[in-house]
């Protein structure tokens, strides 16, 4: 699996998934979306040993206009987009969210949702936060599936989790 993502928090989250599922996931952090092109994706993948079963995932926030159009131009990639931001996925582990929300409000709502999130910092998860995320994945998946893809709020991160679950069952 190849996961391209823009932020450090996403990298830390995917590293947690890689350790939990014990699956070969290559994480390619691209800080800015402006440089994501089909050619760049292929160049990055060429630096790794590839198999015919490899999948490409793009984990990006949709808080900037035109991001979605840029991502859709990358062939054979599964979009794991969050609107407005990655923290929505974390929030869905703790609570339902159906109405439109701004990025700052998602983070504030996450911090207020449960005591383990009170001191949430981007790009790091405490042991308790990791345990909570792994234990409540199923709940978050169901909540995410109930949202309209690419709209605010929504997240497609559950698609990666479902494929990892399938991979583990093989």
Roles of regions detected by a PLM:
Residues 1-11:
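Catalytic nucleophile-elbow at a beta strand-turn-alpha helix junction centered on a G-D-S/GDSL motif
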């Amino acid at each position: 699996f190849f996961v391209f993502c823009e932020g450090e928090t996403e990298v830390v989250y995917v590293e947690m998934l890689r350790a939990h599922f014990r699956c070969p996931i290559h994480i390619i952090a691209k800080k800015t979306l402006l440089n994501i092109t089909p050619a760049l994706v292929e160049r990055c993948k060429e630096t790794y040993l590839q198999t015919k079963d490899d999948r490409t995932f793009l984990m990006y926030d949709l808080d900037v206009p035109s991001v979605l159009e840029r991502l859709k131009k990358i062939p054979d990639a599964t979009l794991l987009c969050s609107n407005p931001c990655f923290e929505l996925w974390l929030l869905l582990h703790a609570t339902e969210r159906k109405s439109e929300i701004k990025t700052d409000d998602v983070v504030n709502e996450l911090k207020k949702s449960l005591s383990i999130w009170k001191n949430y910092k981007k790009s790091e998860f405490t042991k308790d936060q990791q345990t909570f995320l792994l234990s409540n994945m199923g709940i978050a998946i169901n909540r995410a599936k109930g949202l309209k893809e690419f709209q605010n709020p929504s997240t497609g991160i559950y698609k990666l989790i479902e494929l990892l679950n399938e991979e583990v069952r093989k």
